[in-house]
Amino acid sequence: MKQQVIIFDTTLRDGEQALQASLSVKEKLQIALALERMGVDVMEVGFPISSPGDFASVRAIAQRVKQSRVCALARCVDADIDAAAEALRAADAFRIHTFLATSTLHLESKLRRSFDDAIAMARHAILRARRYTDDVEFSCEDAGRTPIDNLCRIVEAAIDAGAKTVNIPDTVGYTTPYQFGGIIHTLFERVPNIDKAVISVHCHDDLGMACANSISAIQSGARQVEGTLNGIGERAGNCALEEVIMAIRTRQDLLRVHTGIRHQEIYRTSQLVSQLCNMPIPANKAVVGANAFAHSSGIHQDGVLKNRENYEIMTPESIGLPQTQLNLTSRSGRAAVKHRMEEMGYCEGNDFDLERLYQAFLRLADKKGQVFDYDLEALAFIDRQQEEADHFRLEYFSVQSGSSVMATASVRLICGAETRAEAATGNGPVDAVYQAISRITDISVDIVKYQLSAKGQGRDALGQVDIVAEHQGRRFHGVGLTTDIVESSAQALIHVLNHIWRARQVEQERQRLHSPVPSISTSSTH
């Protein structure tokens, strides 16, 4: 009987640490629900002690996710563990994940502790976490550079203290597949109580071997793999879970294990993570890149036409990649739009609001005539982003610009219960619109990143604008999507301003309630 490999997703913890702008609670919840739909066994969704925002995100996800086990990270510190337990309290099933550096380098230069101290700290932390749950995971940070004798000792001690999962991270992506597989093999040979815990691996991609190291670990007996969607994460990123999942599925003959993942959900979950995190997927990215199933060579094209298996080891359908690009027009009704969305795997209510989507569809169809599958997906994504009542909404804008005249913009915004208008000049039409919006809202931001991308094909493509803006030391991500790039730019900035407005409301409410959650700048890349 094939054994199952547990899929542990840390997109919302380790992955989010690498983003230029933190995700909002709503954005994290969207990703968490998509991961649940995809079937991940465990999702690590934050580091509650690190900030009130992370605490709130973990608590919100713990309240909503029912099918996956929700996990939070904590150092081997009592306050960390207590905060994690409090944030997770509402979950049907939860895990506390605590970690400690074990390599000689980290112990001497970072923690200034002996290895015996590390064992004592690990035991204490695991025992404290077990006050709240039987599901405790312990990670040996920088295990890849930890002397093997020491690693065996602390793994045995962690299991003896009650850790149900022991994680062996290659924290800095230093090991090779043969070496890393050997570490896991040695643990199984030398740790006497290893049968009482699941051995997990968490590989980083600094040398481009995170996925290969994870597969090697599976072959040596590891039965949990940690990683992120699209491989996002600190430095060069984490093991890309979609690669490990599809490697397990495609190479059943070699690996003889399976996962509980609904692999048809991989593509759209990957796209959602890319859009919300503002991290485009490289075209040549394995499994989910735009070229993953593309064939340019004449010989390859001929071979694929004769039999797809000549040059495809997996099918686009196996990851849920839509192949048909049916078009709709302004004469199409709600039923047609709903049917097409359902054919692409989206569920009304959970993934889109039909009435809002249909109204956006009609506006787009009036502008460009035909609306394709990728248009509908983009509209549904923007609809999910803007489904909360926004304080700021664009009512009207007009721009005058040319090669020999200064750009001038007139903008009218709905600001809560009132309407305000301003005009401004700028260095180009986008800057002029931004200056006018800034005057209306009286909120000053610095644009850290501005990115324009096409959604669709040819002259009818939609223009998506993603921006990262900084306000009072915090970074916010905004997105806009229309057929007009100036309007998309305006919508992206307004999206940011609504994030800022909501953040102010949350902070005011937190101060009113005198939240006890401490704000500590903390991060980990174990």
From Swiss-Prot:
One of its GO terms (cellular component) is cytosol. The gene is leuA. This is 2-isopropylmalate synthase. Homodimer. It comes from Edwardsiella ictaluri (strain 93-146). Belongs to the alpha-IPM synthase/homocitrate synthase family. LeuA type 1 subfamily. CDD domains: DRE_TIM_IPMS (cd07940). It catalyses: 3-methyl-2-oxobutanoate + acetyl-CoA + H2O = (2S)-2-isopropylmalate + CoA + H(+). One of its GO terms (biological process) is L-leucine biosynthetic process. It is found in: Cytoplasm. The keyword RNA-binding does not apply. Its cofactor is Mn(2+). Residues 393-526 are annotated as: Regulatory domain. GO terms for molecular function: 2-isopropylmalate synthase activity; acetyl-CoA C-acetyltransferase activity; manganese ion binding. Mn(2+) binds at residues 14, 202, 204, 238. The lineage of its organism: Bacteria, Pseudomonadati, Pseudomonadota, Gammaproteobacteria, Enterobacterales. Residues 5-267 form the Pyruvate carboxyltransferase domain. Keywords: Amino-acid biosynthesis, Branched-chain amino acid biosynthesis, Cytoplasm, Leucine biosynthesis, Manganese, Metal-binding, Transferase. Catalyzes the condensation of the acetyl group of acetyl-CoA with 3-methyl-2-oxobutanoate (2-ketoisovalerate) to form 3-carboxy-3-hydroxy-4-methylpentanoate (2-isopropylmalate). Its EC number is 2.3.3.13.
